């Protein structure tokens, strides 16, 4: 039996002040159920950044993982685009 698939999200690094941790803001778009207007919502995730190579402004891919601390349940899997 195959292991369950882990969630993968894309987001922008908004903070790298902590050691081996970055805060990633993930944007989701959905339509309002009644008014059918496009609603954009943001959610911040604390992600483990083992090599400290992701910086503020980078576009990263984060993967769900086991709890690493009280707030960290995600890990930076790859850096998609560097900040200018």
Swiss-Prot record:
Keywords: Ribonucleoprotein, Ribosomal protein, RNA-binding, rRNA-binding. InterPro entries: NA-bd_OB-fold, Ribosomal_uS17, Ribosomal_uS17_bact/chlr, Ribosomal_uS17_CS. Gene3D superfamilies: Nucleic acid-binding proteins (2.40.50.140). One of the primary rRNA binding proteins, it binds specifically to the 5'-end of 16S ribosomal RNA. Belongs to the universal ribosomal protein uS17 family. Part of the 30S ribosomal subunit. This is Small ribosomal subunit protein uS17. It comes from Ureaplasma parvum serovar 3 (strain ATCC 700970).
